[in-house]
Amino acid sequence: MLFRSKLERKSYEITKQYYFIEDWKASIAESKNFISSYPNSPKAEEVFYINLRSNYLLSKNSVEKKKEERLDKTIESYLKFIDLYPQSKYLGEADDIYTTCKKLKEELNSQKNGL
């Protein structure tokens, strides 16, 4: 059990480290690994939020060609997050991310349609 706890803590710290150095792709990958390996961890909610925020920041800073797909992934991540953690302390920030992503998608669609 102690060994698993150390591995869990290490994975958590790596996820946070990638997030803080703004390596969004690595943060997303490591947070997914953490969530699949330790779904019942007390840190799972925070790591899922880091995953959501990393998806958002990656999509926001993407080239136009990849932006829509990444916005869709962020919205999907948000929907999973609120399904799993409807009373989360991160709910306000998560809702803001969702609202911003919807607006960005609308802007992209209106640009595509020449409006």
Predicted regions and their residues:
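Acidic, polar-rich low-complexity tracts and alpha-helical solenoid repeat scaffolds
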Residues: 1-115
